[in-house]
């Protein structure tokens, strides 16, 4: 890496080395050799390096915990390392900030500045600020990198080494791990070294000027590194030393600025030391690339130490750091640490000597040949360590991700590079590579360093920084690193490239660099000091940033987690390196990333580099790109990052996060989350998976801390957070699923148990949907494989799983179980028959017979969706279904078997019929027909059997005939009784049908199974005939059949028939009489129609042909379904409870119908909704307790506790009967519970539909705009009717009316009224139900009363008070108008109509208007042809009497009904409608204002009114185009009124049809957009705005304001002369706002109106949504 980095440093860090290594600027091997020679010759440089090492030691002595200010670090680096580098390159440059001079190493020297500039991000500094600064400085650094800023000739020619050659050298010569002992040092020294490394790498890999890469190492570390390894200076004390040595000790490195860095909680220094030890590691994942074999590193370090006191000091600190790291890494690491520390010190000196490249190269070379030269040795040590680190990193590349994942390094986060954990990782990872690569790299690096000492000096510095980082990271595996070093020398740059890791590496390396490079110590120390407090940014290493970070293009998907030393240690990102890299070293700096090679080094060592760092994924392939992106600066940054940085180097994670990378410190989240294959954060958050992490990923350092989910944690990072391998994930899944099926869990997991089929199986997909499993994997195949490996779970057909221990004891079934004995016998028969059939079927049958309890055989249970099990809870007894299936199979298999099974089947069928048929009610959502005797099942069976005999059986089981019934809404009370009685009655014929169906099934199964028995043939025939019948039914049920998708079309047809006609009897009954299998097709079809064992409520109350619409086909007969939904049974009418407001008893008879004697509560829309919900909840409560309550013939209301006791006892008593196999008990149970439940559910499902309003609030007022022409309706009269709130709910029992006027004989039970009911003949206060509405209702005198009682009272009052005089009767009219819209009952409708017409005939039209509202809105909701005809008839009659309300409602219906244009209108009515094109046309009554002003003589026909007309409700939106004034449309409660231009309105009035149409403000065009809202009481939003009741009416009735619209609507009804008056513009526009009082003179009024009209023209367009409420009214 050193040489590599050094070579790239030509772009940035290398510029320092450029002077010394101008010749070596070329990436040629000669340059590397020259660098090495330069290092060797640079003993003085070594001295400088020693000084730098001393500085580094100072830094490292605090274990990098006390971060010196970056300025100090920079100064020290400049003094110690920069001077040597500059000496090589130019002392002046060293004196100057290398950042400025070299843009690479200069930056490194000015690491503090660079730090501030975001160029240098020492590993130690975790400050986000530092990181940010680094990024900020990148461009600046890069520019210097582009050409040495301080006058050093850019080493493009010389210092910059040709990217190719320089890279090659660098790559070949991995900078020795600059002092494995001191990450910071290495970082500092590596600032030069790593900077060089970065530069070298960048130049080597992408070619010096990958400014972008450098930029990518935007994190302060990277930036600093990029800036002439200024960032690395802190880290690259070694780098600077190397640079000094290498470049020339000519100029003492300027005193490094030490930035106080938060003391790493973890031994970040150790990590950094490793990094510094292996610049190459910088290129390759620093963490992974451990220094060369510990012995070599130690020797080298020792040599370095010997040659450099400072280095020795640094070594000590490095040792501390490395030791800290090493403890994590292990004893070897410790030894390496010591050696690395010495080596780091030596390397720091060497690096200082301008051996940044050379040193790094030498380190790489020397890693193999430990004693390249004293100077070289120093460099070599650094290079060796760097090389070892690089190599280790390279090897660790594989583990790089692991280390990245490793949060153990996180503990070292203060170093950000996570050297400690990284080192641990590096040790294990790097040793793998070290043996070969490290030595080779070391040798190569030495050669490269020699050739490119001058050029590499800065690069070397960076390289060393990286190397130092790498040393920290990779010292333990330095031997491996050695081999890798060669690669890493190239890769060193790449390691620098990893931004996140670089930042970490740099930070870590900075401590290492401080220790390793006394020279760098100044920069590194300050960085360490300054950065110490900044642990907080460490949390960012989490993968969070990784996702954001550019993925390593070629880099390993795996990145080390925080644990990755290289990652954490990565010399502070190649930020500084970038800067130098920008110049020349910058290229290399970038390539330090490349050197690290995960990113930048892709070209040369990218792959190998990448191996070391999971970040290398970003570094190796991305390094090149990143370096390119970062440019020279990025390269320098990468190199500066050194090994650590290189690992992460090029990957400047330009993430949405601040600081480029997510990481606060500028290094993106390193370890944990960066791997390409990140572990979900939630997984990362749990340590339980730690053991699943790769060694690298796992927290290698106990001291390391890690950030997870944005939170910083101290201690080893759970490996699980890092990454789980496939086996670990599989194991975790297996354990999780085993837990789901464990006794401990199942005892309380009722959800899971309810999802089980009778055999205890649960679809794997359900398990896969659990969050804990999803957290592990989303691949069902993985889950299936994990389940297969479990010895506690059993998987069937790959899609269902259950526990192996007593699986059938867990399913919670609501269906009574049939005796297993019969099923067994049947199963045996079936087995015999099946033996003749396909073996699979036989096996299936045998399984069933053998284990009667399990309905599904393993195969069956696991049948894929073909035979989707019914709902999770099998509705039918577990055994019943299999038995039935078996019976069917038997019948098909052999006639005899069929006969035998028929007996059993008949019993089972009877039992199943009642239970399953009604259970089907629970499955109302399922589209299976209730009647598919065996048809639907056979169809599915056919499909299944075609695939597999057993499969077919499974399919059958999965779809027990009874299971797939579709049950329509039932009458709540009668359903129970009906079910109890009907099932037996209907079961008999259905059984034969069922048998026929079974035969069909058998035929299907036979076809698929190819079993050959005469019985099968007969069934086939039967099924064929049945199919034919079904086909007849198919028109409606075809869709259902299609839904079922069976193997054969015939089966499908049968399924359709079954679906259609199949009801409770569908499967239950058909199994009863297998002997009837051969029933004639016609008979079967007929039987199918009659197959239902019960009638739907609609059928009972309004008999419908069995095959008409009652058997709802989900896909076809939507209207039928809707119709049933909107039907209301007569017997349910008797259950109605009316909730009405009861006023105080009148003091005298003869009410003033207009008197509001009842203090009606003003109910807003919100309150209305609350009350409606309360009634719904109340009703649900009634029905949930109904099953029990209905049985108790008590009038008394019992407490809830008593009720529960009673109910509980009853339930318990009932449950045992369910278990009882015999059909009779079963039927009894069904009668009580199953039927009741089904009825209850079906009824509730329909009656409690959210769309059904329970409370119809009355409009608060009928205020009408006095200026608006009115309609001929009661609400627009001077004395509008008083309307009352009314609500309803459905009781659980019937309240039989004393008279038969309303009560339907159907379903009326003589004792129904005797049931203690909440409804009673006398109004009762509402029972307490837990809902806010209860208090509202009670406070406002709402009482509940049985409907028939209330109805009879209203009629009584009507008779007593006379037509139209009864308020209660009016309330009843209103109730009918709303209730019948969604709950149509023919008898109720007929009564409503007759009474309304009777009242109308006597001059009281309220009832008739309610009737018209029902017509209009009810037909819109559910079109009924007979009602539509009545609507037309009544409309014509009403119009012919001179009324317009009926016509208005008909007009509105045609307009708003979705199919209105398709309706046929009677010619006479159509003729009447021709004159009404707009809702305004119905406003024929003069405005109320005229009546008010009649006493004022000035009111003349031609007089103009002040009021602004509002468009009638029919106008959807009125756009007032003229003028800035808005028309005064104050009535907001009516959507009808939209202010319009008076002129337009006037024109409308003048030419209602013409202009309204033309202008478009007329009703039709705009009305199309209007929504008609429902009546006030309706909770559902209606497309039409209904009667006022639909929404809270705000009476904005400002008597004095003529501009205020009255509820009545717009002016359009004004007489033409009035319109003309309105049109007249007058100055009094203000009158629009002002209200003209009735007392105002007519003239004033006219003036106001005129002005209003004028203003209207000027009024800006105002869009008002008008409700069609007026049209509705």
From Swiss-Prot:
Q: What happens when the gene is disrupted?
A: Mutant males show multiple meiotic phenotypes such as a failure of chromosome segregation, cytokinesis and mitochondrial partition. Defects in spindle pole organization and spindle formation. Mutant-derived syncytial embryos show a range of mitotic phenotypes, including failure of centrosomes to migrate around the nuclear envelope, detachment of centrosomes from spindle poles, the formation of multipolar spindle arrays and cytokinetic defects.
Give residue numbers for the modification (Phosphothreonine): 107, 828
Q: Which residues carry this modification: Phosphotyrosine?
A: 1315
Q: What's the superkingdom here?
A: Eukaryota
Localization recorded for this chain is: Mitochondrion; Cytoplasm, Cytosol
Q: Where is the composition biased (Low complexity)?
A: 41-54, 179-208, 239-251, 294-392, 437-493, 512-527, 943-954, 981-1083, 1299-1317, 1543-1568, 1622-1673
Q: What is the effect of changing residue 107 to A?
A: Partially rescues mtDNA levels and hatching rate in spoon null mutants. In larp-10A, loss of phosphorylation by Pink1
For bias kind Basic residues, which ranges apply?
125-137
Write one Pfam family the protein is assigned to: La
Q: Which GO terms describe its molecular function?
A: mRNA 5'-UTR binding; poly-pyrimidine tract binding; RNA binding; RNA cap binding
Q: Where does it primarily localize?
A: mitochondrion
* Compositional bias per record (Polar residues), positions renumbered to this chain: 60-69, 1575-1602
What this protein is reported to do is described as: RNA-binding protein that regulates the translation of specific target mRNA species downstream of the mTORC1 complex, in function of growth signals and nutrient availability. Interacts on the one hand with the 3' poly-A tails that are present in all mRNA molecules, and on the other hand with the 7-methylguanosine cap structure of mRNAs containing a 5' terminal oligopyrimidine (5'TOP) motif, which is present in mRNAs encoding ribosomal proteins and several components of the translation machinery.
Protein name listed in UniProt:
La-related protein 1
Look up and give the organism this protein is from: Drosophila melanogaster (Fruit fly)
The opening ranks of the lineage are:
Eukaryota, Metazoa, Ecdysozoa, Arthropoda, Hexapoda
Name of the gene: larp
């Amino acid at each position: 890496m050193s040489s590599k980095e050094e070579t790239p440093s030509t772009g940035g860090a290398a510029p320092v080395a450029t002077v010394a290594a101008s010749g070596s600027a070329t990436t040629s091997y000669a340059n590397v050799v020259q660098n090495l020679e330069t290092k060797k010759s640079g003993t003085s440089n070594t001295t400088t390096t020693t000084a730098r090492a001393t500085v580094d030691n100072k830094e490292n002595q605090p274990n990098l915990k006390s971060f010196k200010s970056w300025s100090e670090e920079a100064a020290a680096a400049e003094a110690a390392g920069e001077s040597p580098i500059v000496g090589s390159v130019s002392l002046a440059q060293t004196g100057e900030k290398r950042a400025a001079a070299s843009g690479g190493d200069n930056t490194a020297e000015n690491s503090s500045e660079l730090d501030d500039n975001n160029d240098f991000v020492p590993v130690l500094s975790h400050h986000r600020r530092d990181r940010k600064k680094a990024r900020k400085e990148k461009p600046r650094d890069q520019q210097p990198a582009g050409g040495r800023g301080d006058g050093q000739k850019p080493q493009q020619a010389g210092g910059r080494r040709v990217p190719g050659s320089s890279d090659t050298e660098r790559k070949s010569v991995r900078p020795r791990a600059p002092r494995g002992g001191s990450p910071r040092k290495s970082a500092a020294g590596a600032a030069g070294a790593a900077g060089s490394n970065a530069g070298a790498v960048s130049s080597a890999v992408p070619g010096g000027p990958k400014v972008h890469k450098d930029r990518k190492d935007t994190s302060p570390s990277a930036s600093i590194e990029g800036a002439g390894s200024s960032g690395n200076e802190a880290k690259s004390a070694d780098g600077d030393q190397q640079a000094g040595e290498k470049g020339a000790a000519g100029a003492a490195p300027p005193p490094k600025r030490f930035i106080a860095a938060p003391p790493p909680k973890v031994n970040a220094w150790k990590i950094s030391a490793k990094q510094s030890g292996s610049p190459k590691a910088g290129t390759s994942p620093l963490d992974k690339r451990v220094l060369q074999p510990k012995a070599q590193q130690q020797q080298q370090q020792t040599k370095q130490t010997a040659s450099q006191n400072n280095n020795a000091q640094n070594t000590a600190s490095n040792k501390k750091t490395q030791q800290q790291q090493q403890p994590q890494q292990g004893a070897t690491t410790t030894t390496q640490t010591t050696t690395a520390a010495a080596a780091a010190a030596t390397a720091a000196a060497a690096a200082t000597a301008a051996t940044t490249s050379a040193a790094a190269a030498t380190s790489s070379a020397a890693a193999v040949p430990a004693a390249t030269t004293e100077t070289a040795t120093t460099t070599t040590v650094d290079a060796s360590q760097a090389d070892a680190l690089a190599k280790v990193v390279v090897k660790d590349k594989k583990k790089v991700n692991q280390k990245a994942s490793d949060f153990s390094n996180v503990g070292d986060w203060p170093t950000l590079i996570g050297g400690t954990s990284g080192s641990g990782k590096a040790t294990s990872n790097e040793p793998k590579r070290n043996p070969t690569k490290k030595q080779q790299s070391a040798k190569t690096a030495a050669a490269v360093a020699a050739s490119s000492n001058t050029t590499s000096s800065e690069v070397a510095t960076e390289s060393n920084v990286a190397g130092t980082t790498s040393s920290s990271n990779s010292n333990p595996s330095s031997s491996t690193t050695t081999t890798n070093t060669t690669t890493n020398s190239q890769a060193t740059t790449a390691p620098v490239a990893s931004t996140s890791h670089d930042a970490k590496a740099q930070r870590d390396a900075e401590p290492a660099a401080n220790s390793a490079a006394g020279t760098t110590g100044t920069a590194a120390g300050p960085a360490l000091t300054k950065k110490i407090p900044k642990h907080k940014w460490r949390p960012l290493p989490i993968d969070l940033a990784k996702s954001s970070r550019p993925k390593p293009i070629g880099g390993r998907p795996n990145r080390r987690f925080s644990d990755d030393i290289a990652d954490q240690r990565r010399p502070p990102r190649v930020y500084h390196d970038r800067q130098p890299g920008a110049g020349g070293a910058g290229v290399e700096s970038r390539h330090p990333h490349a050197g690290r090679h995960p990113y930048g080094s892709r070209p040369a060592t990218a792959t190998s580099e990448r191996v070391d760092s999971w970040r290398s994924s970003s570094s190796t392939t991305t390094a090149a790109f990143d370096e390119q992106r970062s440019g020279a600066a990025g390269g320098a940054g990468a190199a500066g990052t050194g090994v650590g940085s290189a690992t992460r180097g090029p990957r400047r994670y330009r993430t949405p996060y601040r600081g480029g990378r997510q990481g606060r410190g500028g290094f993106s989240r390193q370890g944990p989350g960066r791997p390409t294959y990140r572990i979900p954060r939630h997984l990362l958050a749990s340590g339980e998976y730690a053991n699943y992490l790769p060694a690298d990923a796992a927290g290698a350092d106990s001291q390391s801390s890690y950030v997870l989910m944005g939170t910083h944690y101290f201690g080893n990072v759970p490996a699980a957070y890092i990454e789980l391998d496939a086996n670990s994930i599989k194991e975790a899944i297996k354990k999780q699923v085993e837990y789901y099926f464990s006794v401990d869990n199942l005892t309380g997991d009722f959800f899971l148990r309810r999802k089980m089929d009778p055999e205890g199986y649960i679809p794997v997909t359900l398990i896969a949907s659990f969050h804990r499993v999803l957290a592990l994997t989303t691949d069902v195949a993985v889950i299936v494989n994990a389940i297969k490996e479990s010895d506690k779970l059993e998987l069937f057909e790959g899609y269902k799983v259950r526990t192996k221990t007593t699986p059938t004891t867990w399913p919670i079934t609501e269906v009574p179980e049939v005796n297993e004995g019969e099923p067994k016998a049947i199963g045996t028969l079936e087995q015999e028959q099946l033996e003749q059939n396909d073996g699979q079927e036989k096996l299936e049958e045998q399984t069933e017979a053998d284990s009667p309890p399990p309905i599904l055989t393993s195969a069956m249970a696991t049948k894929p969706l073909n035979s989707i099990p019914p709902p999770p809870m099998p509705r039918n007894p577990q055994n019943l279904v299999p038995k039935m299936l078996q019976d069917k199979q038997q019948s098909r298999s052999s006639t005899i078997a069929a006969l035998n099974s028929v007996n059993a089947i008949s019993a089972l069928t009877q039992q199943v019929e009642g239970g399953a048929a009604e259970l089907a009610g629970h499955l109302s959502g399922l589209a299976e027909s209730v009647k598919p005797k065996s048809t639907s099942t056979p169809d599915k069976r056919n499909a299944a059997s075609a695939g597999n005999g057993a499969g077919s059986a499974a399919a059958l089981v999965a779809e027990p005939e009874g299971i797939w019934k579709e049950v329509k809404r039932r009458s709540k009370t009668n359903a129970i009784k009906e079910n109890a009685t009907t099932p037996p009655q209907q079961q008999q014929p259905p059984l034969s049908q069922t048998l026929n169906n079974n035969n069909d099934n058998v035929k299907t199964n036979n076809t698929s199974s190819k079993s050959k028995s005469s019985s099968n043939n007969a069934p086939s025939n039967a099924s064929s005939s049945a199919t034919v019948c079904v086909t007849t039914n198919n028109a409606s049920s075809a869709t259902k059949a299609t839904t079922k998708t069976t193997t054969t079309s015939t089966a499908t047809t049968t399924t359709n028939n079954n679906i259609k006609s199949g009801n409770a009897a569908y499967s239950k009954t058909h199994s009863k009489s297998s002997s009837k299998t051969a029933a004639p097709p016609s008979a079967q079809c007929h039987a199918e129609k009659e197959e239902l064992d019960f009638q739907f409520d609609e059928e009972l109350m309004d008999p419908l042909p069995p095959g008409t619409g009652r058997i709802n086909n989900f896909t076809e007969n939507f209207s039928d379904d809707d119709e049933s939904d909107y039907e209301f049974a007569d017997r349910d009418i008797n259950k109605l409870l009316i909730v009405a407001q009861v006023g105080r008893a009148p003091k005298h008879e003869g009410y003033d119908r207009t008197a509001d004697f009842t203090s009606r509560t003003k109910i807003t829309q919100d309150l209305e909704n609350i009350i409606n919900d309360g009634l719904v909840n109340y009703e649900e409560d009634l029905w949930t307790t109904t099953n029990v309550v209905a049985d108790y013939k008590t009038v008394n209301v019992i407490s809830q506790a008593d009720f529960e006791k009673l109910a509980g006892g009853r339930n318990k008593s009932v449950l045992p009967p369910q278990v009882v196999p015999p059909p009779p008990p079963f039927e009894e149970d069904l009668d009580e519970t199953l039927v009741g439940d089904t009825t209850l559910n079906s009824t509730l499902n329909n009656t409690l539909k959210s769309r059904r309003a329970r409370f119809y609030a009355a409009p608060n007022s009928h205020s009408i705009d006095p200026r608006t022409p009115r309609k001929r309706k009661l609400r627009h009269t001077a004395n509008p009717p008083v309307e009352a709130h009314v609500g309803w709910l459905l009781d659980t029992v019937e309240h039989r009316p004393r008279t038969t006027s309303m009560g339907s004989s159907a379903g009326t039970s003589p004792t129904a009224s005797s049931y203690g009911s909440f409804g009673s003949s006398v109004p009762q206060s509402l029972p307490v139900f837990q809902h806010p509405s209860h208090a509202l209702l009670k406070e406002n005198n709402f009482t509940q009363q049985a409907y028939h009682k209330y109805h009879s009272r209203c009629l009584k009052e009507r008779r007593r008070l006379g037509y139209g005089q009864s308020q209660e009767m009016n309330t009843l009219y209103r109730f009918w108008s709303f209730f019948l819209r969604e709950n149509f009952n023919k008898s109720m409708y007929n009564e409503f109509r007759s009474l309304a017409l009777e009242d109308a005939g006597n001059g009281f039209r309220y009832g008739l208007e309610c009737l018209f509202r029902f017509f209009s809105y009810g037909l819109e909701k559910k079109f009924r042809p007979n009602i539509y005809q009545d609507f037309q008839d009544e409309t014509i009659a009403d119009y012919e009497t001179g009324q317009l309300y009926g016509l208005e409602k008909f007009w509105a219906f045609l307009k708003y009904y979705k199919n209105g244009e398709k309706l046929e209108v009677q010619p006479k009515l159509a003729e009447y409608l021709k004159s009404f094109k707009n809702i305004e046309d119905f406003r024929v009554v003069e405005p109320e204002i005229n009546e008010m002003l009649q006493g004022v003589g000035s009111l003349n026909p031609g007089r103009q009114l002040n009021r602004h007309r509002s468009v009638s409700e029919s106008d959807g939106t009125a756009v007032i185009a003229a003028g800035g004034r808005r028309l005064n449309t104050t009535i907001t409660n009516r959507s009808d009124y939209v202010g319009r231009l008076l002129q337009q309105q006037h024109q409308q009035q003048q030419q209602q049809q013409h202009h309204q149409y033309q202008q478009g403000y007329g009703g039709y065009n705009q009305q199309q957009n209007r929504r008609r809202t429902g009546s006030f009481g309706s909770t559902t939003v209606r497309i039409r705005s209904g009667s006022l009741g639909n929404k809270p009416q705000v009476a904005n009735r400002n008597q004095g304001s003529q501009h205020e619209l009255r509820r009545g609507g717009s002016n359009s009804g004004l007489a033409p002369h009035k319109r003309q008056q309105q049109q007249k513009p007058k100055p009094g526009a203000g009158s629009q706002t002002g209200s003209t009082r009735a007392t105002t003179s007519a003239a004033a009024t006219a003036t106001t109106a005129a002005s209003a009209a004028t203003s209207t023209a000027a009024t800006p367009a105002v869009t008002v949504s008008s409700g069609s409420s007026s049209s509705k009214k």
